[in-house]
Every structure is written in C-alpha cells, then in structure tokens.
Amino acid sequence: SDLQSNKKSIEPKVIKSNFSPYKTLDTFFYKNKIFVSYSNKKENCYNFNIDYAEFNLNELNFNNFYQSTECSIQNYYQPHGGKMQYYSNNQEDGLLFTIGDNNDIPKPDDSIVGKILFIDFQNQNEVIFSQGHRNTQGLFSNDEIVLSTEHGPRGGDEINKISYNKDYGWPFASYGEPYGSKIYHPLNKFYEKPKYLKNHSKKNFSEPIFAFAKSIGISEIIKIPNNFSNFWNNNFLLSSLWEQSLFRIQFGDNYNKIMFYEKIFIGQRIRDIKYHNELNGIILALEEKGQLGIITTKKID
C-alpha cells in the first residue's frame, strides 16, 4: 500500500566552505566533526580522499584527513564506494571506509582498490581490513559486527559479514553474470572474460550472508532501534536503487544467515538512509527528484 505521511518543508541552508571535490562519495559525523569522502581528478587519473572539518552551520573549513597515493587511470576506473563508519581496531579509534572496484582485472594485494580500509584518527595510519570487494555501497559497524552491501555484476548483489584479513572473492567469485565477453585493459588490450566462481569457499573466499540473484541496486544498510516499532525489534533496513524499495531484514544468530526479509516499495531510487533520533524516524535520500523522505511512527508537526 502507499505510504501515508504528513508533508514538512525543509528549507536548505547553504554553508560556506573551502570544499571543492570532483565527486563527493559520502559524509560521516563523529564528535562534532564532519568527514567527507571524495574522488579528485588529476591530470590523467583519479585518487581517493577524505577531508574533515569542525561542524559549524555558518562555515566549514576542511583539512585533509587521508589522500591515496594510488591513482587510477582515467577512462579505465574511477573510485566508487567511499562509505565510512566509526570503528575501533585493536583499541585504536578510526574510520572504516570502502573503495570499490567495478573492473574485472585482478588487483595487487597492496592496492587499495576493491578493499575496505581502516585509518586511525591519531596517526592516520592506513590498514587494509578486507579485500575482494566490487562496489561496496553500504557499511554498518558496531561493537558486535561489521556488515557491508555490494553491487554485483548483472545480479549477485551481496550482504557480507566483514572480518579482518578476509577475501570476499571479487573479481574471481560472484553470483552475478559478466557484462560482455571481453575485459578492457588500460594498455589497450582485450582479454577473454572468465566465468565467475559461484561457490566462493572452494577457493577460500568468504561467502556472502546473502546474495540477490536478480540485482536490486543495493545501497545502504542500517540497524533500526527497537523503540522505532514493537514489530521491528532487532531489524535492519536495506535500501535499493533499481528496486526503488526498502528491505526489512532479520538476521539469524551470529549474522550467518537471513531469517526473513520484507520488501517495502517506495517508488524512487533510494541512495541512502539514516535513522533520526529526535523524529524516531528513517530519512531516505531519494535520488530521482532530489528529495528527502521520512518514515516515522509519530506525527510530524
């Protein structure tokens, strides 16, 4: 059925800043600081960056927090993902963040492409946390678990339970199907595209918790507080682009499987979702019309 909601206009506020990226990927708030991940275009390549600023509604003065030394060749690859979450790694506080890899060519183990990385706040030291990721669009972290969502090729969108130093298979294993039969390499060569392994574990890759056979255009994943609804206890929400829907999810013990999911049709591509404490509601970033949607169990004045 159609969602019923009260309309509330939100007047946008323009905040002055010294921030001028080529492509913004994600924003994240931590202890009155705003972190922004983005890609920058160099002379003939793209690199990945994170800047931060003390949050101020009048003006934001950004400083660089992280800049990749690796630069991806123009017209071959641009950084994707860029999702960020707080994480404590060996008692060091920092950020987990994702750098996607839409290309089928295997990357060196020391490349940041197709990885989830950790960088600590104090020294900005970079650690590869996990690898074998295609295009990680959603990231969730708390004291109990790290979860990610990942676009597959022509199907095979994944929900993954992330563990340190594990390999999740891309570009060798996927439940999706190849686009075309050739791989383009930046040295102007073409290679036959191999078929993807469907059983990740045969080659010691980590299996996803769940994979959608048909692509939903998977995006963000969040946990819903139990006070949102008595009927949604210990539930997660997953957003989607292609399906224009939310998916309410219940995981099993130890997050090794999904017990059930419920599809909730919204009718627009949902790029991002966040829970808002004061509203006790879920805010949706609706892509096609540039709108914000709110789902709440109480009346909005």
Cite the ranges covered by each PLM segment.
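Conserved blade-ending motifs and adjacent loop-strand segments that build the rim/top face
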Residues: 256-277
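Beta-rich catalytic cores
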Residues: 20-25, 30, 46, 78-80, ...
